[in-house]
Structure formats: C-alpha cells, structure tokens
C-alpha cells in the first residue's frame, strides 16, 4: 500500500509557490560554480554546450588515467659502461688515499668512491698520518658537487677559453718585464714542495716577480716570534699526550688555533689511566671548545690574559716584569703558574694572543720548562702569511707599481678588513687574474677569472710538517673540463710543456728517497728524516717589558673568532656546514655577537623563547674605528668574559652563494690590522632576530643521571666505592629496592650467539668537535631542511651533541643544591630552586654528550608501532623498515631519548629544499648503500647497518674471523679522540667488551629500563 507521507527538507518546500523551491528544482547548486578559475578560457565559456553528463565523463576519464599513471614506477634511465673499468665493481666501494690543504684546514684522508663518485671522507689511519679530518673536511665532499662552481674561464666577466686567458697572461708578463713593473703571485699558504718549486722557477723567469703569502686568518705574530728565535718561518708543533699540566692563554687549540689537529694527542692524556690524567687550565674571553674541556677555566679579557702570561713568565723564569692583573684572577693564575712550574718538562704553555711579544714569552716559558710537549722536531708549515707584506702590496698597487697580479686560493675582496681599498688599488693594476673554485667577490672584480679544480679532482703534494710528505691524488675526473689547475698554469707560463703529474712525480723522487712512488700514492704519506729546529737567542726581557705596557680596551673588547662549522668562510655555500649546530651555542644558519649576561643587562639586550619554542634575540650595531656592522643578532653566552664580546668570521658572503646560504654579517671588516682583538661600541637597534637553535635546555638542573661526573681525587680514592660516584638507579619491587638494570618486563633473548653490537661514548674524550655529525650526514644521506625548519624543531640530524652548562660554578654543586631541596616553597623549596637551576652560571662548567638512537634491547618505540616498522635484531640494532612506516610518529612520542626524526616533507628532488643534494650534480654525493627516505617516514640512527653487514660479508667471503676494530660506524670512524668506540661485545677480546666492564660505564636514563646498546663513561675532572 502506497504511503501518502510527504518528506521535505525545509519549511519553504511546503509552499508550492515559493521562489526558493523553484530555484532549487532547476539548479543543483545554490551558488554558481567558479568554473572560470579552472577552465581558464572565459571568452569561450559562455558558448560552451557541454552537458553535465559529458563533463562527468571527462572528469572520470582523467581521474582513471591519473590513477593508472600513479601505478607505474618511475623510469630511471641508466647508461651502461661501454667498457667497464677494471677497478670498478658496481656495489663495491673503492678507497683512495689523498690529502687536503686549503690554507686553513689540513688532513690525511681516505676518500670513499662508489661507481667512480667520491661520496665520503674518512681518516687515513696509517702510521705517520697524524692529521685527522674535522667537520669542515668531512663536509668538503659536498663542495665538489656544488653547482655554483666556476666552470670555465672569464675575461671581463664574459665566458672565454683557457687559451685566451693564457695568451693574455703571457703578454702581460712580457709587458711587465719590459716596463720593469712588478708581477705578484698572491696565494694562501701552500706548503707544497712542487708548487713552491714551480713558483721559484716562475720568479726566476720574471725578475720583477714576487710571491706574497696571505692567510685570511693570520698567525703572523707567532710566526714572527718563532722566526726570530729559531731562524725559520714556521710554527712549533705540540704533543699534548706528553703533558701533565697544560696552560692555555687565549688559544683554542681544540678548535682552529694554528691549524688545529691537536685533539687526538690531547684526548690521550684526558682519559684517566692508572689514576693519572692531565690538568688543564684555560684562560679566554669567548667560550670555546678548549674552554669547555678545561678543568679550570678563567673567563678574562685579552688585557688580563697578557697580564696572566707575564705573571706565569715571572714564576717560571724568575723574571720580575711588571704585572697589572685584576685581583679576582690572582689566586687562580698563580695556582696555574705554580703547578706548571712543578710539572717541569711535563708542563706546556700555549697562547693565541696576537702579539709578537706575547708569543716570545711562550717560547721562553717552554724553553725554561724544557717542555716535552713543545715539539720543535717537524715544525708546522702552516699559515705562513706576512701581514706586513700584504700591507706593502696594497701600497704598491695604489702606486701603480704592480703590472700583473695573479691570485690563487685567496679572496681578499671578502677577507681584507678594508676591501674597498683593495678594490680601488686593483683598478690600478694592468692585469689581474684569479684562480678560484667560485666566482667569488675577488673573481668578480678581477679582469680574468679561471675556474680551478677541486682537491678531489687534482694531483698535488703537501708537507705540512717538516719530514712528512703527503700526496693529493684525484678521485674523479674534473667535473668541468674547462677548469684549470693553478700548478698546470704555472708550468705553461714557465714555458714547460710537461704535465703537472709528471712534474710532481719528478719532484717527489728527490723527497721520498728511493721509496716506491706507487707505494707513496697508495699510502698517501711518506715519513722521512725529520729535522729539529734549534733554539736561538732573543731578548725575552724586552718582550716582557713591552707586553707589560699593554692597555685595556676602551669600552668593550671585541674578540673575533672562527666557528667550528664555517671556519674562515671558504665553504659558506656548503649546506651541511650551515645546518651544523655550533657546539657551544647550538645555533645554526647564523653568526651573531656573543655577550655576557652582565653586559647584556647593561645594554638592554635579551634572548627569549616564543610560543613554539623558537629562540629570539635582540639586534645590535657594532662599530670599530668608524666601521659599523648593522643588525647583528645577539646571543647571551654563559662564560663570556665580562667586558668582552665575540663575533665569528666566515659569514656575510654574497657572491657565488645560493640565497639561502647568504646569512650573517661579514666580521672581516672589523679585523683591523689583522688583529682579532679590537675596541668596539655596541648599540642596541630595533627588531628581533629569529634563531635556528636546536637546544633550548641549557643546564642539567641537577639531573646527574644524564651526565655523570666525578673528580680525579674521588675516582682514585680506594676508600670510595664505585657506587658512590657511579650510582646505579634503583626501583621498587614489592617495596624492596633493586637495581633498575635487573628488572625485566620482557623475556630476554640469548644474545651470546653471533654478533652483538655496542657503541661506547667516553665523555672525557669527547671535545664536541662535531666531525661525527657531518660524517653521519654523508654516510646516511641525511637531508638538509633549512633554517626555518630547524627553528620548528624539524632538523634531521641522526646524531646530536648535547651541550650542558652548570648552574653553579660546577655540576657537582648543582647536584648538591638539588639534593638539599626541602619542600616546595621557602628558601630551599624545589619550586624556586629548579627555576634557579635553569639559569647557567656566569662562568659555568661545560659538558658535551653525543646522543643517537640507543638501540635499546627493550625499546619503547618498538612496542607502540602499529605496523611493525621498527623492530629489534639479534645483533642489538634497532631496525627501521621504511616501506612499512605509515608515519604515526608514536615511536617518536614514546622514545625517552628523542632521537627519532620525521620527514615532514619530501626533501629529495624538492625545489623548496634546494640544498645541493637535490639537483642532478648534488645527488652524486648520495650513498647508494642507504635508502633515501620519502615524506611521511620516520628515520633514525641505524648504527650503520650497511657498514656492519659489509664487514660480516667480507669476512665470510675471505673465510676469516673479524678482527677487533673492523666493525665501524660513520661516527666512530670519524672520531679522532677515541670518544666513540664501536664493536662486538660478544668478542671478549674487543675494546668495546673491555669498556662495557669499565667502572665508569653507565647507560643513559638507566631507570627507564630500556637496556640500551649505547654505553657512556662517567666524566672525570682533574679539579
């Protein structure tokens, strides 16, 4: 039976005469559809007669077509070898020994290549190869594939051929000889026997020629002092492993001081063995890596550093030079001097003060001590530039005395304090030519610019210390065939038709003393007879007298420095280094002025966190002798000496950089007279700066279970139990306290079968240098996300190095304060007490802690993953199956160590993240053994499973047992201090098995019960 019920949607439908009802009957949509926006052709739209049915057909077809297309995998076209090179086996990496020296950084290297592509830098661990790669050297592999390299030659900014440049230079040399005007080679420190020989031949052929060495960051005062005492322009070497007492006055020797490379020998003396470790005093203005590692750090201005040096000189030598030392430093400086004197030959003093008189006193003190750590055998041939000669060159250029200027490895238009003066003088030079990797500031104003080869594309040699000879060999053919190596150009200008390789080989034959050329190429280094520089005489008393006349800075004292990431700025276009967080401030993508809390309060400067956790700060302008830098962001730095400020060099470049990399200010403009200390005036300006800071928590707040510390006295005291300084966390079971490590919520597997990997992190040996961070980046194809994503806490580093300050003068006092909390409120209440513990001390102790996935045996991430994308192996590694991951991020929420990283975007092949690795050339650096992750996928440290599996398979193929040390991860392989040791704990003879049983061993957040396979070692301070 039919129903008479009437259904309606609105009251208006009950009225048959309603205009609304009529409209709804004739029109499906109340409002007109904005078809103009997607159909585009508005003129034809009105005459279109397409029916709704046809329209749906077209939409349906296109939807189906798009769906079918999406089912197809991407087509990747590969070009096979016509004749496969014998030495290349697809899927098997090759390693080549080589050497890098760019005038600032030096290292003996192994270069990993895959199918002919260099993809990773590793340390050459052969005996004699003592210089290891820092973060910048590890990142230099990416600069090879920089699409903004200068790919050809240019004359007057127009593309040309090398032949045209060559002809013009030869004509210019002939004109200079006829006119009797100067021909000047302006280079960085070369330390290359073959290149120096070529230059000598060039000067012989050009009688008016000069060779002037210019280093952007000068060590001229130290060179001048050493030359006046030893008779050669070089620098002393140091072996800190031989020192029981180390006193550093303004020298960041764990950073870039005099070329760096001292962390290995320093770390040997810092790991407590047989109850002994070195005692280290650091006196400095800026907080540095060396200051962070010190047992006793004195934050003082450069003026007070000079006075401290004079006092130590008096104590060690018995002199009576006038000393004007601020009262608050006297006790600690005298303590350092007395301990240094007591150490005798086991003591050493170094200084970074840019003053010849100060450097003479350093030599006098070490001579008086007969210091074993002060090594004059095999002196350093580094940063040999002369400030006076560079200044004279500019005068000669202004006077029109220079006809031809040939530059290589330098960028004076960027790095000279008064670059406008240099540019003006350059206009008076008839011909100028620059050999450069980039069309940088100097190349742009030179009449001729020549793109040169990268060190990974070149032959070369380096003798960075006397008696050692290192070779540079190409690991790939030049990516840009029109580039020209500087040495080959010199050969042609000398009228020598030889290839530079043949010239190099002939030069080396007289140095390697009959050794096999092929063997030296294979090893990358040859060690011959090492000469010793002999102490001469100098007027040390006059030097002390002159130094005592020093005056404090008028107003604030500016101390210019170089950051661990960018150094002198040569690799400013390298996104790995731009995104690398500074070990001290934890800020990336910026330079800034560091000020003390006291000075910040006086000037009204602030740092603060906004709602999303991002760090913001004030702006200032800095003025030195009439030169002003505007809008410099401010970081309030714990440990900055009151009355001093710091700014890093190497930023503010504009030429040949992608827009994203054009960050910071150029502090070289304040580097007056090549002195890193200047009187400066700071003025607060309007605005707030947004920092990309990866660590907002500055202190431990007394949480001693994260970074455990003790003193050497307690460590050595037989009356003190290990439990007292390496306390094991307890939990309650049935109201009975038991050790947390004994409690299991899961049934444990038998892990004694096969391999079981552990990674050891020694807090005593870690200097925070960050080489491991960049090595991990390279090995595991970690993406670069840019400043704004870092600011949103979306950085992708698999390994981070946390930095903590003490709230009191030491971490032990923080713990003591926390233990004495009584109730919630009051003088000893925890509410106010924890707030105070969040504020870092004016001169805090510092601790670094490398944190990566802990590869927990009872991993909280594994239990919450709904698709089993993360799981555990019998070898102790926590695995990620990227193709199973659906991006719930439950694992990241449940990880107590916060080490998982989520791909918020598709970083690969995405123009929004154009950081080298996304263009065709940049992708050549990718490791084929590691998958490139896509959007929506979680990733983390894999404990370099591709490396461990290769080691296992290689040993299986060879039918042998794996030796201790063969198992490596990218981070452990890059660590030059021994802070990171990786291995198989089931091999009871292995180093890591020994470290697991060490009294200093503990696990991070042990009370959580995750049972990690990463172990840490208690930090011991020799206070």
Predicted regions and their residues:
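Active-site phosphate/pyrophosphate-binding segments
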Residues: 296-398, 510-517
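Hydrophobic alpha/beta core scaffold segments
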Residues: 400, 414-444, 448-457
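A short, gly/pro- and small-residue-rich
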Residues: 256-276, 417-433, 468-469
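Short beta-alpha connecting loops at secondary-structure transitions
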Residues: 292-298, 451-457, 468-479, 922-929
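Long, low-complexity segments enriched in small/aliphatic residues
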Residues: 510-586
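N-terminal export/assembly segments and adjacent metallocofactor-ligating motifs
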Residues: 1-334, 563, 587-591, 598-602, ...
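Flexible glycine/proline-rich, aromatic-decorated loop/lid segments
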Residues: 438-473, 796, 903-920
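N-terminal leader/propeptide and maturation segments of large enzyme subunits in energy/redox metabolism
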Residues: 46, 477-536, 788
């Amino acid at each position: 039976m039919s129903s008479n019920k009437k259904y309606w949607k609105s009251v208006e439908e009950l009225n048959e005469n309603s205009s609304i009802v009529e409209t709804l009957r004739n029109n499906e949509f109340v409002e007109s559809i904005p078809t103009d926006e997607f159909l585009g052709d508005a003129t034809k739209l009105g005459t279109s007669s397409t029916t709704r049915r046809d329209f749906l057909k077209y939409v349906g077809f296109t939807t189906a077509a798009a769906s079918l297309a999406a089912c197809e995998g991407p087509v990747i076209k590969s070009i096979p070898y016509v004749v496969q090179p014998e030495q290349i086996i697809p899927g098997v990496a090759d390693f080549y020994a080589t050497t890098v020296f760019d005038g600032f950084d030096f290292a003996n290297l192994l270069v990993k290549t895959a199918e002919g592509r260099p993809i990773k830098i590793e340390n050459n661990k052969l005996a004699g190869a003592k210089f290891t790669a820092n973060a910048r050297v590890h990142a230099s592999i990416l600069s090879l594939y920089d699409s903004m390299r200068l790919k050809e030659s240019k004359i007057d900014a127009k593309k040309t051929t090398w032949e045209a440049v060559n002809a013009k230079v030869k004509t210019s040399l002939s004109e200079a000889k006829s006119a009797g005007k100067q021909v000047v080679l302006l280079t960085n420190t070369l330390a290359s026997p073959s290149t120096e020989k070529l230059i000598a031949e060039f000067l012989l052929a050009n009688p008016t020629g000069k060779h002037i060495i210019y280093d952007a960051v000068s060590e001229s005062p130290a060179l001048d002092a050493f030359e006046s005492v030893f008779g050669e322009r070089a620098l002393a070497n140091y072996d800190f492993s031989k020192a029981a007492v180390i006193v550093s006055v303004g020298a960041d020797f764990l950073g870039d001081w005099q070329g760096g490379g001292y962390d290995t020998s320093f770390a040997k003396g810092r790991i407590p063995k047989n109850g002994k470790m070195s005692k280290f005093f650091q006196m400095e203005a800026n907080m540095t890596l060396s200051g962070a590692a010190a047992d006793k750090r004195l934050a003082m201005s450069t003026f007070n550093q000079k006075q401290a040096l004079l006092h130590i000189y008096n104590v060690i030598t018995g002199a009576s030079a006038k000393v004007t030392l601020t009262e608050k430093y006297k006790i600690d400086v005298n303590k350092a001097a007395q301990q240094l004197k007591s150490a005798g030959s086991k003591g050493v003093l170094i200084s970074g003060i840019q003053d010849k008189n100060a450097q003479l006193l350093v030599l006098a003190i070490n001579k008086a001590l007969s210091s074993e750590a002060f090594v004059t055998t095999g002196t350093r041939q580094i940063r040999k530039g002369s400030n006076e000669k560079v200044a004279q060159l500019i005068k000669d250029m202004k006077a029109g005395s220079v006809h031809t200027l040939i530059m290589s490895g330098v960028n004076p238009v960027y790095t000279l304090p008064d670059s406008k003066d240099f540019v003006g003088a350059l206009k008076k030079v008839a011909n100028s030519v620059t050999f450069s990797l980039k069309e940088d500031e100097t190349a742009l104003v030179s009449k001729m610019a020549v793109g040169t080869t990268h060190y990974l594309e070149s032959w070369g040699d380096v003798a960075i210390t006397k008696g050692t000879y290192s070779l540079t060999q190409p690991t790939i053919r030049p990516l840009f065939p029109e580039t020209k190596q500087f040495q080959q150009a010199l050969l042609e200008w000398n009228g020598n038709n030889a290839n530079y390789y043949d010239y190099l080989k002939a030069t080396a034959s007289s140095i390697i003393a009959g050794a096999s050329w092929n063997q030296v190429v294979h090893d990358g280094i040859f060690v011959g007879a090492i000469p010793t520089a002999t102490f001469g005489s100098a007027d040390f008393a006059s030097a002390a007298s002159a130094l005592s006349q020093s005056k404090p800075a008028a107003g604030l004292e500016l101390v210019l420095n170089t950051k661990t990431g960018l150094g002198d700025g040569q690799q400013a276009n390298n996104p790995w280094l731009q995104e690398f967080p500074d070990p001290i401030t934890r800020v990336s993508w910026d330079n800034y002025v560091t000020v003390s809390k006291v000075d910040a309060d006086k000037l009204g400067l602030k740092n603060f966190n906004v709602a999303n956790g991002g760090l913001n700060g004030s702006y200032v302008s800095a003025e030195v002798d009439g030169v002003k830098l505007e809008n410099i962001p401010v970081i309030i730095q714990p440990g900055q000496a009151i009355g001093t400020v710091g700014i890093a060099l190497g930023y503010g470049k504009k030429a040949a950089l992608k827009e994203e990399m054009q960050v910071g200010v150029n502090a070289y403009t304040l580097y007056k007279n090549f002195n890193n200390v200047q009187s400066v005036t700071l003025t607060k300006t309007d605005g707030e700066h947004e920092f990309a800071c990866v660590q907002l928590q500055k202190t431990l707040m007394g949480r001693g279970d994260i970074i455990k510390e003790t003193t050497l006295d307690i460590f050595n005291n037989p009356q003190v139990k290990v439990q007292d300084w390496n306390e094991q966390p307890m939990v309650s079971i049935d109201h009975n306290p038991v050790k947390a490590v004994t409690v299991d919520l899961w049934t444990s597997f038998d892990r004694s079968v096969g391999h079981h990997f552990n990674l050891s992190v020694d807090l005593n040996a870690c200097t925070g240098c960050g080489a491991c961070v960049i090595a991990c980046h390279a090995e595991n194809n970690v993406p670069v996300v840019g400043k704004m994503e870092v600011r949103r806490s979306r950085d992708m580093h698999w390994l981070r190095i946390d930095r903590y300050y003490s709230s009191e003068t030491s971490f032990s006092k923080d713990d003591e304060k926390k233990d004495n909390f009584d109730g919630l409120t009051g003088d000893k209440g925890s509410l106010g007490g924890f707030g105070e513990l969040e504020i870092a001390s004016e001169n805090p102790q510092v601790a670094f802690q490398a944190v990566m996935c802990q590869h927990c045996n009872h991993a909280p991430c594994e239990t919450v993953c709904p698709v089993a994308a993360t799981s555990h192996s019998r070898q102790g590694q926590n695995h990620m199956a990227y193709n199973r991951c659906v991006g719930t991020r439950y694992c990241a929420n449940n990880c107590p160590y916060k080490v998982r990283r989520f791909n918020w975007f598709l970083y690969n092949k995405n123009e929004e993240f154009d950081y080298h690795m996304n263009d065709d050339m940049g992708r050549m650096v990718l490791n084929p053994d590691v998958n490139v992750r896509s959007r929506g996928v979680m990733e983390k440290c894999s404990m370099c499973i591709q490396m461990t599996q290769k080691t296992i398979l290689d040993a299986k193929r060879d039918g042998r047992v794996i030796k201790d040390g063969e198992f490596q991860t990218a981070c452990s392989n890059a660590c030059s201090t021994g802070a990171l040791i990786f291995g198989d704990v089931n091999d009871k003879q292995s180093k890591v098995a020994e470290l697991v049983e060490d009294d200093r061993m503990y696990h991070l957040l042990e009370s959580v019960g995750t049972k990690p396979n990463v172990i840490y070692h208690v930090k011991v301070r020799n206070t």
